[in-house]
């Protein structure tokens, strides 16, 4: 049996946290899934058995920070699954970890390996808590305590940049740096330190997620129209990019999965 819940953060945390999701699965046999880059970092707590990342032949840590990803991962269950995940707004994760999040790119960094006693204590308490509601309350209390130390002055400008990327199929570094009121060099550095990847790569990930969203809501759309709506140069460009991020062409992907955009849906 599988249950999946999306939980919205309290209003005060919404500028920093997109949502929480909780997955429980006691299905007999191995459950496997291919995950694609979402453009958002996350904080993951396993209360059940850990997942195995099969294409890297490694087990996920018990609790970990998932950095920005540049490609797909194949994950498989090793027993009963019980996961609680906090998904950050693209520009907000650095507030809670006090490090340049570029260091976390393409990595699952165990909470146990981070010099942050409060975060390690949170992981233990989430693991031992009676129910999911208590877990979410503990996680939100931790986030509130982090925010007591203030937020970076450039956070609003990065939020505006992300909003522009979300709403535009065509933009460039110069336009984004102008929105942020920074030089292109300053902008690229601050963007990467706070979002965990370069502006160019982030825009490519958002374009991938937009492609999934259009496919999700327009079953049977032609690939030429899809590439036009999502801002690719042409159909061959879209197919190349999609395969780079997912391991499949769009046609191969929809033959295996129902396309869903985590970024634009939740």
Residue spans for each PLM region:
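Long, low-complexity intrinsically disordered regions
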Residues: 188-193, 197-203
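A secondary-structure capping/hinge motif
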Residues: 194-197, 240-253
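Short Lys/Arg-enriched helix C-cap and helix-to-coil transition segments
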Residues: 203-204, 254-255
